[in-house]
């Protein structure tokens, strides 16, 4: 049975919290509740992720399948918080893991389930599972959701002891929207990867600025000598600003 934060009851004792605001995780709490028989409480608003709310729920675990917000030390210090990161840690700590991997020509990765600690993505590892990075970002995130569901069930059933990370640490920098500019692509493969790795709800699409126009790309497919994609053409922000300034001068 899955419950929301607005519902309070003693049956919540020992429940689990699922923190994610991403659309591809929308049904995960319901699915996990059905598969495990446990109460899963979904938190999608960062403002609701407070020690007061979590104390009321008293969760065994707080799972973060896709969470881009800061987790306060009062939360991970009091509750067992498990983050799911889309790299084979300690390689690829930091932001935009999916995009940074594909930009480096890496098409197979692992999802690492780790304990939340003060240093970003540095906590001990519960387990890792493989993940393919082929397809659009939306398809990859949906695929990752299925993998993460199984990982959560394994954590609940096996209660693995998290182990320190081993290997050389590599840190990724969070990518900015400007890095989606198609002018940086030097081959059809790079153009295809740039389009698909940004093709998900909530992400800025790959784009080109041509004169006053901004051309955004999605739904790419790779052919032998070309890339096919849907395009959306709009007036670029700088062109809108110039047009507004010209009107104000008249």
Residue map of PLM features:
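One-carbon transfer enzymes
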Residues: 1-250
């Amino acid at each position: 049975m899955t419950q929301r934060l607005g519902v309070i009851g003693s049956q919540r004792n020992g429940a689990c919290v699922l923190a994610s605001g991403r659309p591809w995780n929308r049904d995960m709490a319901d699915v996990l509740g059905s598969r495990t028989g446990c109460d899963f409480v979904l938190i999608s608003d960062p403002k609701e992720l407070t020690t007061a709310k979590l104390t009321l729920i008293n969760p065994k675990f707080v799972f973060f399948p896709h969470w881009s917000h800061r987790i306060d030390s009062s939360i991970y210090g009091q509750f067992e918080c498990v983050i799911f990161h889309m790299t084979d840690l300690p390689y690829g700590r930091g932001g935009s893991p999916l995009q940074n991997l594909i930009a480096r020509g890496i098409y197979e990765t692992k999802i690492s389930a780790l304990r939340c600690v003060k240093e970003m993505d540095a906590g001990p590892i519960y387990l890792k599972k493989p993940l393919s990075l082929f397809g659009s970002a939306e398809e990859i995130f949906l695929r990752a959701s299925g993998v993460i569901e199984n990982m959560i069930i394994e954590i609940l059933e096996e209660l693995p002891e998290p182990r320190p990370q081993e290997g050389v640490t590599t840190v990724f920098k969070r990518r900015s929207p400007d890095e989606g500019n198609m002018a940086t692509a030097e081959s059809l493969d790079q153009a295809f990867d740039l389009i698909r790795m940004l093709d998900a709800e909530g992400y800025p699409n790959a784009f080109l600025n041509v004169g006053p126009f901004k051309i955004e790309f999605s739904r790419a497919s790779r052919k032998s000598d070309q890339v096919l994609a849907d395009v959306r053409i709009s007036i670029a922000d700088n062109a809108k600003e110039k047009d507004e300034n010209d009107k104000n001068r008249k």
